[in-house]
Amino acid sequence: MIYLDYSANTPADPEVLDAYVAAERRYIANPNSTHIAGQEARAEMERATQSIAQRLGVQPAEIIYTSGASEANNLAIKGIAHASRHIGKHIISTQLEHSSVGASLTALQQHGYEIDLLDINRDGRV
């Protein structure tokens, strides 16, 4: 099978998958739990966050973990819209966006934002 929809799902690199499985086996507790296993999971999560932040050149507090793409899209779109509302409340997107993007834009529209959705031609071009 040739899978071409990497926008929706992307196979994990085997090395990444191995690291994930090892961490999943070792750190079984909720990192917000107060018991020892939770504290160990929290320490590993903080170590990983520090490593990611260093590689990205940001502060660890700037990294936000979400449960998936829909939550991340919602947080990013509404967050930047509200943070930039003093500049303007006009957002341009496309008809091709993920449904979570559309839902966020609809919510913003109900709060006074002007939303324009551009059409895509048969070649996928705006």
Kindly give the residue locations of the regions a language model identified.
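Pyridoxal 5′-phosphate
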Residues: M1-V126
